[in-house]
């Protein structure tokens, strides 16, 4: 779908929510930090960790999809911001490629929870997991003040021209659109949530636009099995 059909909207939104597994949270103590070894050995271990850590590789300008000049440094939770762009999933996600990630967030907590719960349950189904599963996430809040391409319907009486980009299963059309917009300098995309009716999500393409990142609540999902909606606890 041509990028020219996606119009821009001035977005000024505080307190968007992104959920990150607590084991990846910025305040989680690293494994290496607990080791008592000579400094020379510790430095070697850090280099080894960096060789297998996409975020570290990106900050060293070793990744093909994003340059170090686009990443951020010296701001709170910059590692969390950079990780969103350097840890690209195999096959990509709705608006990102296998080589470059994006900062996905929701405008409301219920939307963020629904998006995360869907994808986690999908992962459980893929491995035929049939036992109880309890998993915890940390909210990361961020503010956005920029022009984003907007895929939300302007006329509720007409079909969305971006319906194929909001397909619940296929990411082919959405990734093509995102790649086109990214190459044209887009800040990112605002779009209706596919997993929570009436919800709104944002996919930011530029690390520098992810503003004022801070931690929110801890969210725990309890899946009795992968076929049922989880119980959610905010604490």
Where on the chain are the PLM-derived regions?
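Extended catalytic/binding region for NAD+/ADP-ribose chemistry, centered on the ART fold
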Residues: 94-120, 190
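Active-site and NAD+-binding cores of ADP-ribose-processing enzymes
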Residues: 1-67, 71-96, 121-235
């Amino acid at each position: 779908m041509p990028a020219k059909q996606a119009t821009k909207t001035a977005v000024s939104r505080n307190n968007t929510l992104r959920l990150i597994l607590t084991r990846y949270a910025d305040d989680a103590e690293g494994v290496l930090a607990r080791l008592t070894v000579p400094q020379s050995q510790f430095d070697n271990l850090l280099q080894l960790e960096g060789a297998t850590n996409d975020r570290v590789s990106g900050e060293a300008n070793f990744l093909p999809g994003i340059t170090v000049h686009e990443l951020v440094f010296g701001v709170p939770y910059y590692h969390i911001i950079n990780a969103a762009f350097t840890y690209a999933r195999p096959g990509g996600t709705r608006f990102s490629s296998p080589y470059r990630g994006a900062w996905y967030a929701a405008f409301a907590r219920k939307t963020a929870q629904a998006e995360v719960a869907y994808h986690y349950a999908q992962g459980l189904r893929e491995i035929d997991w049939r036992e109880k599963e309890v998993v915890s996430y940390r909210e990361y809040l961020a503010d956005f003040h920029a022009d984003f391409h907007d895929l939300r319907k302007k006329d509720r009486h007409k079909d969305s021209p971006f319906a194929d980009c909001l397909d619940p299963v296929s990411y082919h059309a959405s990734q093509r659109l995102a790649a086109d917009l990214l190459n044209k300098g887009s800040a990112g995309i605002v779009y209706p949530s596919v997993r929570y009716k009436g919800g709104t999500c944002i996919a930011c393409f530029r690390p520098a636009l992810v503003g004022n990142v801070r931690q929110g609540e801890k969210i725990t999902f309890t899946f009795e099995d992968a076929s049922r909606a989880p119980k959610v606890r905010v604490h």
